[in-house]
Structures are given as C-alpha cells and as structure tokens.
C-alpha cells in the first residue's frame, strides 16, 4: 500500500473513531447530528474542526482546578454568607431556587437592594462613584474591556483606588478583550498597583489541547463585598465599540445590587481568579477572612429587600443549569413570558418548550435586535421564526441599535437577568452568570425595561414572513443544520 492509501486509511479510521465518540457522548442529539453532518460532508476539514472545537477541552490542569471550585464555594458560604433560609416566594418559583442550590450550591439571599441601570452614562457614573468610595477591594471581571472613550474614567478611578491601598483586581477575557491586551492599559494599570489577569489565554499550540473558543463571558463588578453589578454590559463605550459592524450602538442594562448577593458574586469572581492564577484556594479563603475581619459590619438586610440567587455556569460539565432553569420557568408560566436576547439559536427542546408554552394560552413575546453582528447567527435565528409564529409566539424586532440585554420575565413575578444568550454556546460552553430574581418589585423594573424595548420594536407577521424569497429560506435551512454548533 502506498502513502496515499495509508493516509486514506488513517483518515477513515480517525473519522470513524470520532463518529463513534460523537454517538456515545452525552451531547444533545441535535448537536451530535450536526457534528456528524460536518464530519462526513467535509471529510478532512470536518476532522480538523472537530479536533479543535468539538469538545469542551479545558486542559487537564484547568479541569482539575475547576473540580476544586465546588468545595471552595461551600467553604466560602460557610464563612461569609448568611444562613440559608427558605425562599419567600411562590411555590412554583421556590422549586427553581431549590434546583439552583442543588446543582450549584448557591442559595437565594434576601434583603438586597437593587437599582436597574439602562443608560451607559448612568452605568459608568455608578461604576466610578462606587470605585471612588471603595475602602477594601474592587473586583472586575468582563468579557470585553476597551479602554477608550468614557471607559477611561473607570480605569483611571481603579488606578486611584489602588493608590489608596484598595486591592483592585481585573480579570478580562483573552479573546474578547484582545484590543485591551494589545494596548498600553495593562502595563499602566499594573504600574498603578492594579492586579490584571488574562482569562482563558489563547495560542496556536494551546488550541491543540485546550478549546480556544471557550470564553469567559461574565460581566461582574464588586466593591467591598457590599455592592455588585452584573448584566449584559461589557466595559466598552458603545459610541466607539464596533461602529463599523453596521448594527448601531449596543443597548445594555445592568443591575446594581447591595447586600449578600454581592458576596455570592465575589465567590464566582474568586473562583475564576484562582483558576487563572493557580492561586491556592485555601490561601484565598484565609486572605478573605483577614479582609472581612478588618471591615466594619455592613448594613443589616433591608426588610422586604430583593430575593436574588446567583446562577453561574461553565464548561466541563454535562449539566446546563441556566438552560434547565429557563425551561422550568417556561413550564410554570401561566400568563405572560417576555424574553430579550441578542442571539437566538435554540435547540429542539427549547424551541418546543416555547411553542408549547404559547399553545397552552400563555402570551409569549420574543424581542430580538433587527440587526446583529453575526451573519451566521442571523440566518440561523430566522430558521426558527416560522414555527414560533405559527404557534402564536409574538416576534418583535428592535430597531434602536443592537439590543444586547439578556432577560426573561415570567408572569411579572420572576425574572432571569444576566449574561446568557439564548444559544447553545451560552448554555453549554461559556463561563456565564445570571441572577434569578424572585421579588416582584425588581421584576417589575425589568419588565418595564422590556416593555420599553417593545415600544421601539416592530412585529413580524406570519403571512409576510412566509413570502420571503426562496433563496433566503434555503440559506436559513442550510445554516440550521449546524446551528447547534454556533
């Protein structure tokens, strides 16, 4: 047998072994079929692509480190978090709280005060004000950081805080914040005393054993373990960010929280920080104990304050906690569901859950941006419009920029708010964080925000949608075949 024959045989054996691995893996059937399609439709390319991004490869050291995080959180909760109480909310939503606690260890905490920020100027001014008032620590974790425009004020406030002796730590994703890492900002921040770390570093050789498209998509800012922010907002100036993409300014929202939930989000941050820096988690706990002992007692829980629960998610697990929570919330909806997401690429199970929710008489409203910055995602999303519209789901296209807010409101009494898009990448691959909101007052604020988006949106009509060109339908259906991989 010549060399060509040996190569063909090797390729066949490798493809067969990969196909068997796909079939016997615990991934969804739609994702498995999509990978098999890519593998055999593009013989050599399919093998290469699968070896690079086909599995949630964290690397051995990182995977072992991730396994330590659950014990770290348990110890963190025992030392720093208030005692667990039964969530005071409706039984149907209390069951969601129990699900999150059982799978993640994070409990619902009451007595928090919240403020929803929906304007970039208000968000950045609040960031700067809290950093300027910091006495002990400033913890920042973002997918995208760009030190331009109005963001410069935040980074400068961080440097001033470090100069006052406040411990300031910034964790930014290597790929999402690539322009930040190429700039002079990391050096300037470190020179001022700010600890700066790259999350999930990428490299040509590294991608052979660590999947390079697994990203840290979290957006968190914590000050003195007392105040915390999370939501869809990256640390960028929308007036300058991706202006050549033709989608307009990004539209985001952030929830400012004060109370025990800030300590829960601190646990998420410190776990990520320790993994990236190979810090000893026990030493981190001891260090935190010293900080907390030196801090004055915080304000007591606000009577009737917001009941919130942190829902972290990360790769390297067969579970998709946020996905499970979302499906459970849809299943217990009785009156109205409103969803805002920039990227909508559901799997068959989530699609069917949305359809069945609408068919049983619940008003289901899905708000999407009219223009997105990914052509593949745009075509993949459109492939799902017709079955949703036929089932009675209301589709609204927001035309005031790229709507980037990720929120779900159920019956005006429960909400999910955070960083998670409605696609399999967010559910299964990225490091994400969401808040489950159980208090009607905070849910009402989020609901009012989504109603404001609805006022600036136009409806998609089924009859008009069915009249689109055949070539568009063909492209949408082709892209849908690989949509579980997007």
What are these regions (language model features)?
Residues 1-324, 328, 332, 372, ...:
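N-terminal localization/anchoring segments of enzymes in phospholipid and broader phosphate metabolism
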Residues 353-357, 383, 452:
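Short, solvent-exposed amphipathic alpha-helical segments in soluble enzyme
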Residues 380, 392:
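CN hydrolase (nitrilase-like) catalytic-core segments centered on the catalytic cysteine
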Residues 395-399:
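Active-site donor-binding acidic/aromatic loop of nucleotide-activated sugar
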